[in-house]
Each structure stands twice: as structure tokens, then as C-alpha cells.
Swiss-Prot record:
Pathway: Lipid metabolism; fatty acid beta-oxidation
Keyword Transferase appears in the UniProt entry: yes
Cell compartments where the protein resides: Cytoplasm
Catalytic-site annotation from UniProt: C99 (acyl-thioester intermediate), H392 (proton acceptor), C422 (proton acceptor)
Protein name stated in the entry: 3-ketoacyl-CoA thiolase
Family named by the database record: Belongs to the thiolase-like superfamily. Thiolase family.
GO BP terms: fatty acid beta-oxidation
Pfam short name (any one): Thiolase_C
SUPFAM superfamilies given in the database record: Thiolase-like
GO CC annotation: cytosol
Gene behind this protein: fadI
Subunit structure: Heterotetramer of two alpha chains (FadJ) and two beta chains (FadI).
Protein role: Catalyzes the final step of fatty acid oxidation in which acetyl-CoA is released and the CoA ester of a fatty acid two carbons shorter is formed.
Length: 436
């Protein structure tokens, strides 16, 4: 094993995760219909600061992400600073790493802390699948630009006369990979076939996710980390995630038809995560700064790793690539972990990554390692359910996972937790967190 790379500042401080908070996650076009991601981000950051009693001027940097960006406000981070009463001098910039966006935001703030340029910062992400940048066709877009340059009315009319009715149709955001044309669900189908994952296995994992998430809410385990959200038209609050199937049976999952490969597929809407609206954020500080303010950190960031693989085949294997690297940098093995939380983009993707982590052959032939990362103990895995149940506002999921894992590790007496995710573009992310 390579030498561990401790995440500490120049003064020897650990990177403390002081607190975290999220909105409830809502299925597309439900409770947050019409609420843009910026407003969701302002909602969660404002509430988190109010709950923590941390003066806004203590926060020196805010790094936030949004995957489905709105052209009228390309820097969501700065808009959150300006819209929550924080100091106008607070540094703020936005990041995007697809489904691992808030992992990246956390890493960026951690690096600023280690460099000594700040002592406290906020990281997070927000996305809305209900407020989308609906565009225009390329033909219409080019015509509008040319018309803006035209000098006479006749020149403009000539340009517009070339348009056809189809050119006037709205264009929704792309759901396929730009480089390959493959949808995420197509890749999930690839992985199900490559790794021999059956429809029954996928449905069972999805059912487990919903059962455990419902149980977590029933037992009050999530109440401290999920705010009550009031969204226009303010008729009723949203207190819990509204995607969780509390009373479903395994037989219910078997009724759905494949969503991507209609003839031979096994990936359905029920064993995939849905389009979701929501926001999540965490406050990070140097350990000494937290002590100065009299704060008990929720936990600490021990290590992180980002990886990238080919996009044409099984590109959602990011966790299988990034996990061994994050463990190595933390000086740990899979057996040392108290909990493991893997983003469930699809049940097929999740099960494929679990197979790869346990495979000596994958370790040798693909990763160039001598042995497998290890077989994941089910009793440690996604113990409160996962993204299939909670939903997946792309940029918010990582911050949700970090906060949720740290709370649960602390409830279990402390230890280490792994949070890991795949992302579009063949990207992967993994972080080791620690709670005492």
C-alpha cells in the first residue's frame, strides 16, 4: 500500500465538517415545481447558518455547484452569497462535476483550508429538474444572431422566411452524453449485461433502498439534517422527501416495463433514481477555528479521490476506481470502515460496482492492483437507503451523503465512513470521513 496522504493544514489542523443540512428532496414537478436551483441553494444555506449560530462573516468562501445551469445566473455560488445576507466580500465560485459536483465543492473548500487561504467555508450544490433551461433549435438560434446583425427590416424578414415550423419547437436539455450519445440508462443496461445482473437483483436492491429510507424517517434519524422547506405558493411545507415508497412490495417493482432497452432490458423507472429537486450544503473549518468558536464538529474529512474512465463501456464504475485510491490515501482498508454509502444512480450500476470491488480479476486486469478492494458487508452498506429512494438532485447528492453518513457513524459510536459516487463522463468520486 502506498503511503497515506493526511488531509491537514500547515498548522497540523484536521479538516472539520462542522455541520450539514439539506432540503427535503422532491420528485420533478411536485413540491418544488417552479422553484429554481438558486432559490433552493439560498434556502438551505440561509437555514444552515441560522441553525448553527455561526456569524455569516466567519464564512470566507462558498463553493457551490449546479449541474443543470440557468444561463441567466451562471454563478450560483455568488448569487447564494448575495441572497442570504452573507458578507458581500465572501469569495464565491461555482463548480460542476456532474453527479459528483458537491464532492468537488467539498474538496475545493478543503484545499483552501489546507493552503491556509481561509479558515472556514461552505460547500454544497443544488439542482432543479422542474426549472429547466429550455432552448431553441440551432437553426433558430443562428437566425436570431444573424437578425441582430441585419441592418434593414427586409434583411431580417428574409432571414426569418427561411425558418420552418420545426425550427420553432423548444429544445429541452440533453439527457445523453455529448461525446457518445448514450443516456445514463443505456450505460446502466450495459452494466447489467456485462456483469450478469438480473432484473430480480435490481428490483430487490431498489426495494431495500426504499424500505431503509422509510425506516430512517420513521425513527427520526434524518430530522436533524433535513430542514422544513416553504416554497411558493406557500400553501403547505415540505418536511420529508416525497419519493420514498413507504408501503411498496417487491411485487410492485416487477410490474414495470424496461425504460431504456424495451425488448431485452432490465433497467426500469423503479430501480433507477428519479429526476429530483433539492439542495444540500456543509460547513467546513480548520479544527482550531471550530474550537475557537466553541463548535463540536460533526466529523472530519480524512481523504478523497477523483477518477476518470472511458465513456463508451460501463462508464458508471467510478466507485470501483476511486474507492481503493481514497482508502489508500486514508491509510485504511475496506474492513476498517464503519459504514459505506454508495450513490445509487441505478440498481444495476450499484451492483456492478459492488462486484468490481470484490473482484481480484478486476483489481489485477483493470486497476493494476494485486488484490481486490474487498467484499462489501451488507450490514454496513447504504444502511439508511440510498439515492433510488431519496432522489438525486445532481449537485446536492454528495453533500447529502456526507452529512447523512457522519450522523450515522456518530450514532454508532464513531469510526470511518466511505461515501462514493459515479458521475457522467466516466467520472468517479470517493471520500473517507471520520466521526468521533
Amino acid at each position: 500500500m502506498s503511503q497515506a496522504l493526511p488531509l491537514i493544514t500547515r498548522q497540523g489542523d484536521r479538516i472539520a465538517i462542522v455541520t450539514g443540512l439539506r432540503t427535503p428532496f422532491a420528485r420533478q414537478a411536485t413540491a418544488f415545481h417552479g422553484v429554481p436551483a438558486i432559490d433552493l441553494g439560498k434556502m438551505v444555506v440561509g437555514e444552515m447558518l441560522a441553525r448553527s449560530d455561526i456569524p455569516a462573516e466567519v464564512i470566507e468562501q462558498l463553493v457551490f455547484g449546479q449541474v443543470v445551469q440557468m444561463p441567466e445566473a451562471p454563478n450560483i455560488a455568488r448569487e447564494i452569497v448575495l441572497g442570504t445576507g452573507m458578507s458581500v466580500h465572501t469569495d464565491a465560485y461555482s463548480v460542476s462535476r456532474a453527479c459528483a459536483t458537491s464532492f468537488q465543492a467539498v474538496a475545493n473548500v478543503a484545499e483552501s483550508l489546507m493552503a491556509g487561504t481561509i479558515r472556514a467555508g461552505i460547500a454544497g450544490g443544488a439542482d432543479s429538474s422542474s426549472v429547466l433551461p429550455i432552448g431553441v433549435s440551432k437553426t433558430l438560434a443562428r437566425t436570431l444572431v444573424d437578425a441582430n446583425k441585419a441592418r434593414t427590416l427586409s434583411q431580417k424578414l428574409k432571414l426569418f422566411s427561411r425558418l420552418r415550423p420545426r425550427d420553432l419547437l423548444p429544445v429541452p436539455p440533453a439527457v445523453a452524453e455529448y461525446s457518445t450519445g448514450l443516456r445514463m440508462g443505456d450505460t446502466a443496461e450495459q452494466m447489467a449485461k456485462s456483469w450478469g445482473i438480473s432484473r430480480e437483483q435490481q428490483d430487490a436492491l431498489a426495494h431495500r433502498s426504499h424500505q431503509l429510507a422509510a425506516k430512517a424517517w420513521e425513527e427520526g434519524k434524518l430530522s436533524a439534517e433535513v430542514m422544513t422547506a416553504y416554497a411558493p405558493p406557500f400553501r403547505e411545507p415540505l418536511e420529508q422527501d416525497n419519493n420514498i415508497r413507504k408501503n411498496s412490495t417487491l411485487a410492485d417493482y416487477q410490474k414495470l416495463r424496461p425504460a431504456f432497452d424495451r425488448k431485452h432490458g432490465t433497467v426500469t423507472a423503479a430501480n433507477s433514481t428519479p429526476l429530483t429537486d433539492g439542495a444540500a450544503a456543509v460547513i467546513l473549518m480548520t479544527e482550531s477555528r471550530a474550537k475557537e468558536l466553541g463548535l463540536r464538529p460533526l466529523g472530519y474529512l480524512r481523504s478523497y479521490a477523483f477518477t476518470a474512465i472511458d465513456v463508451w463501456q460501463d462508464m458508471l464504475l467510478g466507485p470501483a476506481w476511486s474507492t481503493p485510491l481514497a482508502l489508500e490515501r486514508a491509510g485504511l482498508t475496506l474492513a476498517d470502515l464503519t459504514l459505506i454509502d454508495m450513490h445509487e444512480a441505478f440498481a444495476a450500476q450499484t451492483l456492478a460496482n459492488l462486484q468490481c470491488l470484490a473482484s481480484d480479476r478486476f483489481a489485477r486486469e483493470v486497476l493494476g492492483r494485486s488484490q481486490a478492494t474487498g467484499e462489501v458487508d451488507e450490514s454496513k452498506f447504504n444502511v439508511l437507503g440510498g439515492s433510488i429512494a431519496y432522489g438525486h438532485p445532481f449537485a446536492a447528492t454528495g453533500a447529502r451523503m456526507i452529512t447523512q453518513t457522519l450522523h450515522e457513524v456518530r450514532r454508532r459510536g464513531g469510526g470511518f465512513g466511505l461515501v462514493t459516487a459515479c458521475a457522467a463522463g466516466g467520472l468517479g468520486a470517493a471520500m473517507i470521513v471520520e466521526a468521533e
